[in-house]
Amino acid sequence: MSTSVEPNETEALLRKQNDLSTTASIEEKYPHQQGEAAEDDDDTLKRTQYDEAKETAESLKQVESILAPIVFTALSFFVRFYRISVNDHVVWDEAHFGKFGSYYLRHEFYHDVHPPLGKMLVGLSGYLAGYNGSWDFPSGEKYPDYIDYTKMRLFNATFSALCVPLAYFTGKEVGFSMFTTWLFTLMVALESSYVTLGKFILLDSMLLFFTVATVFCFSRFNNFNNKSQEFSRKWWKWILLTGVSIGCTCSVKMVGLFVTTLVGIYTVVDLWNKLSDKSISWTKYIQHWFARIVALILVPIFIFMLSFKVHFDLLYKSGTGDANMSSLFQANLAGSDVGGGPREVSMFHSVITLKNQGLSGGLLHSHVQTFPEGSKQQQVTTYGHKDSNNNWIFQRARGQPYYDTSGNTTDIEYIFDGMHVRLMHPQTGRNLHTHDIPAPVSKSEYEVACYGNLTIGDPKDNWTVEIMEQASDEDKMRLHPLTSSFRLKNEVMNCYLGVTGTTLPQWGFRQGEVVCYKNPFKKDKRTWWNIENNRNAVLPPAPEDFKLPKTKFIRDFIQLNLAMMATNNALVPDTEKQDDLASSFWQWPTLNVGIRMCGWGPENPKYYMIGSPATTWTSTVGVILFAFIVLYYLIRWQRQYVDFPSTNPHKLKLFLMGGIYPMFGWGLHFLPFAIMGRVTYVHHYVPALYFAMLVFCYEVESFSSRLNKPNASPVSKLLYLAIYIGLLSLVAGTFWYFRYLSWGMEGPKEDWKHLKLLESWRVSDDQYT
């Protein structure tokens, strides 16, 4: 069978043969050019594969940046929400902050050492839970059925859980690699003390949230703080948000001043560097100052003051904290018993109370007990509570005729500026008196006591009324309750009645010390007094149309903050009592002790607040190690080594934002508790721990990055992965092992003996039950 071929097909076959022959001849004549063409094809293929791999990596990076924070946040919410309502009793400081939340819902004024924002948020949680504020959260009591305490706890736990995504994004902004960011985020998510505190109605999670937010915002701002982006919208956005976060942190607890100082250090360094940059004009440099003054000073102050304005507006009824404010402020509270008497003060007939206008305030007080040393006469103190021993009566000065008490009520002697008087204590019949004897505590001033009676005494009983200010439009020469500020000068000793702010020892019932100041300056409010209550059966009541002047917000704001400071300074350890919950600063980073947060009987779940060994111990080692790292770099810098070349700005940024500033943050939040005199507790380490974990993760990043260089061997890359897998597993495994310290240990304490890692942990022992 023959095969026929069409002419066109024949031509095609011939052309193909010729092409093949031509190609073969070219390859034979120019073999090196053919090799180069093959190499070009290989390079093109490699570039294509590289581009595809790069696109894949970028896609995975984008997926990770979305998926990872979601996963970590979900984990954080789970460990904090799980078993959150299993203990239906008031746990630990819920007794304080739950009660403060109730005051907001009842609008009753109260006093506390902390600023109001966190407690107003507690009140908000109660409002959202449908609670009416009628319960005072007695310690250890079971929650009534009408209080949805679970919702209130969930509200607080949300602040704790939201620290985790902020930690993730902070790690990214600082410059951590993906695995280091995961490690840092997991440490925050599974830190036992964070989880435990996040389950209850407390302020610590709110404080931590706003602290973490401040660190994130200023880390984010740092990445826009360069010449190409300065004063851009994002630059302004993040510096303003940093200021808002600072204001919120300080409005929860005054500990926020520590993170404020950290941002201040960063700002000073930044402005100093800009000052030495000759490319920045003076106009632009001044603009940098202006921006920071507005965003980092004025905005936080505004937020802080705004929280107090809302605080005053919400608490418009008389409550338990009235005595810490001025008499005029108290009189303007609804339901107050202050300020209801006559508007004039008269000799003998007016039974008055005297309120000091100094920092510690208090009402002038006396009782039958005497000073153990000095004159050994009847004690005179200041007292913050209502008491009949706070009452005083004006009498004529020693040497003048006694006031006629035969029943003539028409001859009224009003108290006026410059008048010489005696002050008699009606409960004991003795006169307010001073003499050349040192005060019991403040030895440089004169002692004030009560001495004699109506007929027995001497000229040192005499005092001169000096009116300093009048807040109303009434007769400026007369003494008026609430609105007249005055001093009392002893004629013989030439000194002024005042308070020191010092607390007397136990023999003085821990009441305030009263002295006679030898040389006070005229505006010293410790020597200023006003009449708070005025009972007088002879004088008519205040006119119906009379309205007390309102106090000014600024004055109330300053006074309340001074009162908060005074109360905080008074929280010193009592050597005569044992505080089983108190601890020393060195015990926190070492996990030497924790806190039993509730009763330790078998009937209720028990919570032991302590840090996780996997996060606290590692971060403590990290802080110590970092001090040596800084010393190492300083020595090398002194020897003119360049460890942070300008060609690698990422290394310097990572060192500063991941190491130096977090180290400052740890020191600022930890060291003050080592030197302050007030009583301290484990939860005071909560913000400092966050910075310590940042320092530790920087060290992990710094070391591990050397194992993951592009030209690293497979063994190095395997070791790199092993380090992170090991650390992540350690953090997760440690939390899981100790999880019921945070989730609640049910049954007898002996069943949980295996969780007692150190002998000092009071998990299963009978001590301090």
UniProtKB/Swiss-Prot annotation:
Residue ranges of the TM segments: 59-79, 152-169, 176-194, 200-218, 252-272, 288-308, 615-635, 655-675, 679-699, 718-738
Subunit record text: PMT1 and PMT2 form a functional heterodimer.
Enzyme class, broadest EC rank: transferase
Alphabetical UniProt keywords: Endoplasmic reticulum, Glycoprotein, Glycosyltransferase, Membrane, Repeat, Transferase, Transmembrane, Transmembrane helix, Virulence
UniProt catalytic activity: a di-trans,poly-cis-dolichyl beta-D-mannosyl phosphate + L-seryl-[protein] = 3-O-(alpha-D-mannosyl)-L-seryl-[protein] + a di-trans,poly-cis-dolichyl phosphate + H(+); a di-trans,poly-cis-dolichyl beta-D-mannosyl phosphate + L-threonyl-[protein] = 3-O-(alpha-D-mannosyl)-L-threonyl-[protein] + a di-trans,poly-cis-dolichyl phosphate + H(+)
Domain of life: Eukaryota
SMART domains to which the protein is assigned, alphabetical: MIR
GO CC aspect terms: endoplasmic reticulum; endoplasmic reticulum membrane; membrane; plasma membrane
Residues bearing carbohydrate: 8, 132, 226, 324, 408, 453, 462
Cited function: Protein mannosyltransferase (PMT) involved in hyphal growth and drug sensitivity. Transfers mannose from Dol-P-mannose to Ser or Thr residues on proteins. PMT1, PMT2 and PMT4 account for most of the protein-O-glycosylation activity, while PMT5 and PMT6 may specifically modulate a much narrower spectrum of target proteins. Essential protein that plays an important role in virulence.
InterPro entries for the chain: GlyclTrfase_39-like (IPR027005), Glyco_trans_39/83 (IPR003342), MIR_dom_sf (IPR036300), MIR_motif (IPR016093), PMT_4TMC (IPR032421)
Mode of membrane association: Multi-pass membrane protein
Family indicated by similarity: Belongs to the glycosyltransferase 39 family.
UniProt keyword Hydrolase, yes or no: no
CDD domains (UniProt xref): beta-trefoil_MIR_PMT2-like (cd23284)
Source organism: Candida albicans (strain SC5314 / ATCC MYA-2876) (Yeast)
The protein's name: Dolichyl-phosphate-mannose--protein mannosyltransferase 2
Protein location: Endoplasmic reticulum membrane
